[in-house]
Amino acid sequence: MDFQSDLTREISPQRKLGRGKIEIKRIENTTNRQVTFCKRRNGLLKKAYELSVLCDAEVALIVFSSRGRLYEYANNSVKATIERYKKACSDSSNTGSISEANAQYYQQEASKLRAQIGNLQNQNRNMLGESLAALSLRDLKNLEQKIEKGISKIRSKKNELLFAEIEYMQKREIDLHNNNQYLRAKIAETERAQQQQQQQQMNLMPGSSSYELVPPPHQFDTRNYLQVNGLQTNNHYTRQDQPSLQLV
């Protein structure tokens, strides 16, 4: 019973949408039909975009309004997707038609990439001055302008690097000069300190000039010396009553 009721609801022409039930049939009112078309179209385009992004699917959507206006969406290209669809449908009887269509599609993409690579290689050779026979006068002028523009950029960058290198070397020269002056000052200071130390050691050595010889005393007058001694002797030994020493 439940399955039959569910099936009946699915087959019923009425579906519950939003706030109430909307009967799925042609809308007679032109204004309401246009408003509904815009809303449903935007929702359909949004779903197609989400499907292509989330599932990495190739999606192409084509919609014609009642007035014949075209609306389309494709994550790659509508024409490419249609061509792919035609190729897949033409070989629908064959079990490997889809894989063959995919193979053909990838072959076409590979051929496009090879053509792009060939063009880039030719441009590279032309920039080097090779394979110029197939170029016209206009192509040669365009090539010349590109090369001159490239050379101008290269020279500008080279000069910029040279100026930066010169500025660095000048700064380095100033630093070395300052370091040299500092080292010279330190060497001179060290030499002065050594000289002062040597001078102090020389001054402390005996017999150096700092120790002045004491001048010899005045010469004694021998006559005076003898006279004084004689007088002193007479004074000491004139006394006859001086007791003599006796040994016991």
Curated annotation (Swiss-Prot):
Principal localisation: nucleus
Function of the molecule: Probable transcription factor involved in regulating genes that determines stamen and carpel development in wild-type flowers.
GO biological process, any: positive regulation of transcription by RNA polymerase II
Keyword Lyase carried by entry: no
UniProt lineage: Eukaryota, Viridiplantae, Streptophyta, Embryophyta, Tracheophyta
PROSITE patterns (UniProt xref): K_BOX (PS51297), MADS_BOX_1 (PS00350), MADS_BOX_2 (PS50066)
Biased composition (Polar residues): 202-211
Keyword entries, A-Z: Activator, DNA-binding, Nucleus, Transcription, Transcription regulation
Region (Disordered): 196-219
InterPro entries from the UniProt entry: MADS-box/MEF2_TF, MEF2-like_N, TF_Kbox, TF_MADSbox, TF_MADSbox_sf
UniProt protein name: Floral homeotic protein AGAMOUS
Gene Ontology cellular-component annotations: nucleus
Species: Nicotiana tabacum
Compartment(s) of residence: Nucleus
SUPFAM superfamilies, per database record: SRF-like
Domain MADS-box: 19-73
Keyword flag RNA-binding: no
K-box domain location: 103-193
Record CDD domains: MADS_MEF2_like (cd00265)
